[in-house]
Regions:
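Short glycine/proline/serine/threonine-rich loop/turn segments at secondary-structure transition edges
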Residues: 14-19, 87, 117-118, 127-142
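N-terminal carbohydrate-binding accessory modules
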Residues: 60, 82, 144-180
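Accessory beta-strand-rich segments of carbohydrate-active enzymes
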Residues: 1-57, 83-84, 99
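Short strand-edge motifs at loop-to-beta-strand transitions and within beta-strands
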Residues: 4-8, 117-125
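Short acidic/polar inter-strand loop motif in beta-rich domains
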Residues: 27-34, 132, 148-156
């Protein structure tokens, strides 16, 4: 059974200031000889409401650029959407915390994004003395990425990630943090 995740912008169909009914229907239009085709909705359906300038759904990707015992360079890549017709001067910020909730890195950068554009921005952060992730020690960090305008946060996305170094070559095979 395949699970398909998708997003549909219904902005043009919503009547602001009025009650709106949203109906979600799945039609499995392909005939099947099986008594049960498996079609339908098996997970929650969510209504996402966003500002015209926002982080794309599932639009944050956190990547370990480099790592050793003393420092890890982390790239927080954020896909920003500007559905407004005018150019916006906004900021992108990111904060990384350890499992205890202590801030281990944070930063921000100004962004100028044209109207009706989606673009990805990379913010580099550095974590001192990182706790590495592996199968025996699944150390996790939390990220919070936000976009905002002036003093107002417009959108935020959060999640978890592990800091690790992955290597793959024909001689040593797959290594995580230098170990097989």
């Amino acid at each position: 059974m395949d699970i398909v995740i998708f997003y549909l912008d219904i902005t043009d169909f919503v009547k602001i200031g009025q009650a709106n009914a949203i109906k979600v229907i799945v039609k499995d239009g392909v005939p099947s000889g099986r008594w049960y085709t498996g079609g339908g909705i098996f997970r929650d359906v969510h209504l996402m409401i966003a500002e015209p300038t926002h982080i794309a759904p599932d639009g944050v990707f956190v990547k370990t650029e480099s790592v050793d015992d003393q420092i890890a360079e982390i790239a927080v890549c954020t896909e920003v959407v500007n559905d407004d017709k005018t150019m916006k001067r906004i900021f992108l910020s990111a904060k990384l915390t350890d499992e205890a909730g202590k801030t281990v890195a944070e930063g921000n950068m100004p962004i100028t994004i044209r109207g009706h554009v989606t673009d990805t921005y990379k913010l580099r952060l550095f974590v001192k003395n990182p706790k590495l992730w592996d199968a025996e020690h699944p150390n996790l960090y939390h990220y919070e990425a936000s976009v905002g305008e002036k003093e107002t946060v417009l959108d935020t996305e959060t999640g978890t990630f592990g800091i690790r170094k992955m290597q793959l070559d024909p001689v040593h095979g797959l290594r995580i943090n230098g170990k097989r």
